[in-house]
Amino acid sequence: MAVDPNVKTLVDNRRARFEYDILETYEAGIQLTGTEVKSIRAGKANLQDAFALFRDGEAWLHNLHISPHDTASKVFNHDPTRRRKLLLHRREIDRLRGLVEQKGLTVVPLKLVLNRGWIKAHLGVARGKKLHDKRQAIKERQTQREIQRELKER
C-alpha cells in the first residue's frame, strides 16, 4: 500500500494496539473548535484513555484530552476533555453500534491524522486482550528482534 503524501499522522495511540486486538478500522471526521485544531496540529493531544460511545443516533468521542492552546486567551479556549462529535455515515454508526452492543467490543481511536487540511480520527473496533495475550505479543516481538539482529550481523 502506497503512503499518501497528503496524510500526516499528528497523534498516535500506540497503547491501543498493545491492549486490544483491532478487528476493523474506520476513518471519521471530528467536530472541533479552532483552538482544538491548533493544539492538535502542535501535537498536544492524548488518545490514551479515549473511547467512542453512541447516543441518540450519533457517535461521540470521550476522554480525548486536547491541551488548551498556549497563545489563545482564557475566554476563547476550549475545555480539554469535552465530548467531541464523530462525523460518520449513518450506516457506519449503525454498524459500529451493533458491534459494540452485541459482541462486547469497543471503539477506540488509533490515531489522529491531517488529511488535506482536515483532522480525521482513525477508529478501531477492538476486543480487549488478556494478560497472557500481552505477554505472548511481547515474546514474539523480542524473538523477531533477535532474528533481525542475527540476520543483520551476517
Swiss-Prot record:
GO terms for biological process: trans-translation. InterPro entries: SmpB, SsrA-bd_prot, SsrA-bd_prot_CS. GO terms for cellular component: cytosol. Its main location: cytoplasm. It is found in: Cytoplasm. Required for rescue of stalled ribosomes mediated by trans-translation. Binds to transfer-messenger RNA (tmRNA), required for stable association of tmRNA with ribosomes. tmRNA and SmpB together mimic tRNA shape, replacing the anticodon stem-loop with SmpB. tmRNA is encoded by the ssrA gene; the 2 termini fold to resemble tRNA(Ala) and it encodes a 'tag peptide', a short internal open reading frame. During trans-translation Ala-aminoacylated tmRNA acts like a tRNA, entering the A-site of stalled ribosomes, displacing the stalled mRNA. This is SsrA-binding protein. The gene is smpB.
